[in-house]
């Protein structure tokens, strides 16, 4: 299990480096998918299966749609590829930063890292499912605000990417 988690953590950092080096928006989309999948895999290994599924569906369903519009807006005739020197040096610098940060973190203790089901013997329900009831009861106002902000973001992206044509909002 420790090898599995170490592999997932390394893949998470590699995906983040792929997004940060960002040779072109098309290649960064692959990094986003890797980070979303690996992050949800880490959540599953710590016992948050429901939360992991919800985050994966929301992230890939919502954010990649907005990312597709941004990639269409920033279309380049000759995008930088992974084999270019500039991208290679960016990856090397980010990798060096990760190695230095890992050196600092490995000298201390692990902090407050614990599983979601650490006290499952004393609980009747799972910890990640109980957050759903809280989201719809006490967090209902915040849920409506977040839905409104996401709808507004979608309209902003549609307006920005429409160019000189009349766009989608004319039909609404």
Swiss-Prot record:
The keyword Mitochondrion applies. GO terms for cellular component: mitochondrial inner membrane; mitochondrion. The keyword Transmembrane applies. One of its GO terms (molecular function) is NADH dehydrogenase (ubiquinone) activity. Coiled coil: none annotated. One of its GO terms (biological process) is mitochondrial respiratory chain complex I assembly. Core subunit of respiratory chain NADH dehydrogenase (Complex I) which is composed of 45 different subunits. This is NADH-ubiquinone oxidoreductase chain 6. The lineage of its organism: Eukaryota, Metazoa, Chordata, Craniata, Vertebrata.
